[in-house]
Amino acid sequence: MLLFILKRNALLLSRAEHPNLARMGRTADYTKERCSIAATLEVVGDPWTLLILRDAFAGVKRFEQWQERLGVARNVLAARLKTLVAHGVMEAQRYSERPPRQEYVLTQKGRDLSPVLLTMADWGDRHVYGAGNGAVHFVHKTCGHEFHPRLACEACGEVIEGRDLKRVVHDNCQTVGEVLDAVMTASK
């Protein structure tokens, strides 16, 4: 019990140091890590955020459309869209002056998440639903075959798997917290 209380107090202290954690409802503190995956999760790791992105790739641009499709609370949707805009994943564009309304479009940074979402969908189809039972599958328009994403080396074109890679750590990179603080400061 004492260990639980100590861990809880440490988390509360780290949330005080990094208010973004409390805002995002995080239960773990990745802010001191130097990790691209942890940093990415801070931007797009929330389930609502991933579903917002999924729908953006399907052409949804307006707040009301997301709310209707997802059934998400207005305050949650507004917070997720604000985070995506602050991180440059989406851009808010005014489409009506009276009443003032805006729509949200993917930036290049947001469009660069396409392979991530396609890979997640493929993984879910194969490992959650089971092969051949997925909710949605993608067909390559050019060849007409069902699409399954694979990673390839940009330099040589070889299809790769995790075991084909060597991890190189950059010791002088910023922590996740430093990166988040810089983005949130710049977006104010």
Regions found by a protein language model. Give the residues of each.
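Alpha-helical linker/hinge and terminal dimerization helices associated
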Residues: 87, 116-127
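Short histidine
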Residues: 23, 31, 49, 53, ...
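Basic, amphipathic "hinge/linker" alpha-helix immediately C-terminal to the N-terminal HTH DNA-binding motif
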Residues: 45, 96-119
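Short aromatic/hydrophobic contact patches that present stacked aromatics
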Residues: 69, 103-105, 137-139
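C-terminal regulatory/oligomerization modules of transcriptional regulators
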Residues: 1-21, 125-188
